[in-house]
Amino acid sequence: MGNQTSQRPLSQRQLRVGELVKQNLGELFIRNEAKIPFINSKLITVTEVRMTPDLKTARVYVIPLGGADTKETVRILTEYSHLVRKALSKRLDIKFLP
């Protein structure tokens, strides 16, 4: 059958919510509101956010400034994703926080 979700174009709502999440994550990292240990979140750039059709899951693409230690940065962000979600929930007023 294959992966049909990647072939379907994103809806306007998915794009709009994805951009909202991207913008707020960028501001959150600049202001270090998530208080993530071991990394300087001011040096993280959010390049893209892809939302699932039900808007309950987001895939966030980030890159550290200069591209150094990308794997380590992603590992730390994944480990402390609960802090990022908590800080993001204070900024966004949507039904389901991805």
Residue locations for each model-derived region?
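Charge-rich, low-complexity N-terminal segments
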Residues: 1-57, 63-98
